[in-house]
Amino acid sequence: MNFSKKNTKLTTLYLLSKGTEEIAPTLRLSSRRKKTILVVPALATEFTTEENRPVFVNILKQLSKVTYLSKIIFGLDKATDEEAVELAHLLKKYGIKNYVIQNNEGEGFKSIFKTLNDAGFNLEQPGKGKNMFMSFGVAQALGAKCIGVLDADIKTFHRRQLNRLFYPVLALDYEFSKAFYTRIGEHRMYGRVKRLLVDPLLLSLKRKFCDVGDDKFLRLIDYLLAFNYQLSGEVVFDTSLLKRMHFATNWGVEIFTLIEVYRRANNVAQVQFDTKPFDHKHQVISPEDKGKGLYKMAIDIVTTIISALVVEEGLEISDYFVQDLTVTYLNVADELIKKYADNAAFSALDYDRNAEEEMVRGIFKDAILAAGDYFASPYRLTERFLRLLSSDGRFHKYLDQGLDKDLLEYEKKNQSQLFEVPQTVSWDRILMRLPKILHDISAVVKKEAAFYAQV
């Protein structure tokens, strides 16, 4: 294995020996000075459906043997009160004693969301980002100094993986760590969004910016490319960093988090989760429905990346830019698909090259065009409006007086407002506005803990 470092802003920790299995005692000692809390965002279907329940139960069995976690917060979405009680029964059955159930549909946490919304912090959009954001508030209310996130659909989870994930932040004082792993299951390659969208898109952007010598754009692109698995949901934050961060509330949450880390952190690590393949629940392919599945995820990811370049570095988007980027993306994706086909043959894996090419052309290409249209359409709108005015003599005197220049200048000054990814504010900002909010959250947690203890 090549364990050389390729980016000075990112440390990569590889599994070079079995010595990593002995790090749990170090984590226990470190947790005495750094209160450590794990967040598990989950839908009710993770434990109520026959298909998902064994995966969730295995996660509970593994977590019951982890000794350095002060609390485990289960951020529960789309659940009834009865399903929240069912979760409490499961946690007790499998020996999870230090749990907190954060039922976002329950009256207690609804009241917290209402307080935040009434104060002007828009947290209306449902999803993983909103769920995690509230869990981070709960963790802070409980005094956490180190906060981890673990997805609830990992089919191959073992507690050793969690130990590795926490080690950089808890034991080595990094600000952030992120898991990477091999996505292989059922004798085939997975990780389609990473392999067929994120990597070729980032490489296409890098190719474009290298051609014109735009180094300021390359810094962010190179940073994102340095992560071996940008879309992994398994991360750990030092609380001092987490409090300053914003979080996306759409499918771009993982990429957006990396961009926020790029902006705000200096001591960052990625950790090899396991030497064995990693598997979790897969998104459905839905080219006919732009609001679901991989298509929606792809649009959100592309929008998040381009938005960061627009807001952070002042990238100007035009029809030509989007079209040229799409053509470059298709070329790069074709090159990578050839390499994946060769690698699959080398490793005797099943590989459907036609299906991968269809996904690139039928879903991801259209997602890039759709996201590009979102960014470029305001420019076309102004241009079309000016053409309409110039075709009518009644408006010529206004155009002669500089109306067109005023409109274009106004658009340029305000273009950053057109590219905002749906996101939360930082917890630092909330605490400035609502200094008692953590006390309110703590009161809800205590009340609901007493309830779940009796059921």
Predicted regions and their residues:
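Short beta-strand-to-loop acidic/aromatic patch adjacent to the donor-nucleotide binding site
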Residues: G143-K155
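N-proximal low-complexity "stem/linker" segments adjacent to membrane-targeting elements
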Residues: M1-Q62
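Active-site-proximal specificity loops/subdomain of glycosyltransferases
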Residues: E83-L142
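Conserved catalytic core of nucleotide-sugar-dependent glycosyltransferases
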Residues: F157-T239
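Catalytic donor-sugar/metal-binding loop of nucleotide-sugar-dependent glycosyltransferases
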Residues: T249, I259-K276
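Active-site donor/metal-binding and catalytic loop motifs
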Residues: V271-K292
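Terminal low-complexity segments of carbohydrate-biosynthetic enzymes
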Residues: M1-Y14, V85, P287-V455
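Short beta-strand/loop segment that forms part of the nucleotide-sugar
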Residues: Y68-T80, I101-E105
